Amino acid sequence: MYIKTQDGFADGDLANLERLLKIVDDELSTIDGLIRESSDPDSEGLFDRGEYMTGVALTAIQQYIGSTYSQFKINRAAALRLAPNVNHGLTLVSVLNAGANYWKHQDEWGLRAVVTRDVELLGSQAQQTIKIIESLTPWSDYTCSNLISSLVGNGKVRLMALVPQLILWRQEIDLLNAEIS
């Protein structure tokens, strides 16, 4: 939840999210170093470790998104359509939401569908999630990490780089709330 002040915003949820994302980014930096030193980072589980951290961070971002728009009479669909846009008519928060849903639910989609990457075997919500993700990165190994890398644009998986964009989105929420209040 945030409060609008004379100087801007007091946003305790964002402050908590930033603390978490910094911890995750620090861990991802450590993992990157271990990957560079390793002769077989895949067998050592280093890629999986990074993917896990990234997936957990996506769910924290999703929680921030939900706690921000839900304090007003703004529905989820409208909140997910607000700028900033990333590409193909998609918004940053819709992509982050899809990434979080992917992380949380992929294990429920059935082993065959996930291993073969057969979208036709998925339910409609899962298909929509994959469609959004594939607008930025292929559905493949380490999908969450690849998604963040494509959003950040520098080839790195660093989640703090998303915070300025989330702040822009929060400003859009505030503008929409002012319009409907």
Regions found by a protein language model. Name each.
Residues 33-84, 90:
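Short, contiguous, well-structured surface segments enriched in hydrophobic/aromatic residues
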Residues 65-76, 104-111, 177:
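Long, hydrophobic, amphipathic alpha-helical segments used as structural scaffolds
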Residues 8, 12-15, 19, 52, ...:
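Alpha-helix boundary/N-cap detector
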Residues 138-181:
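A hydrophobic membrane-anchoring alpha-helix module
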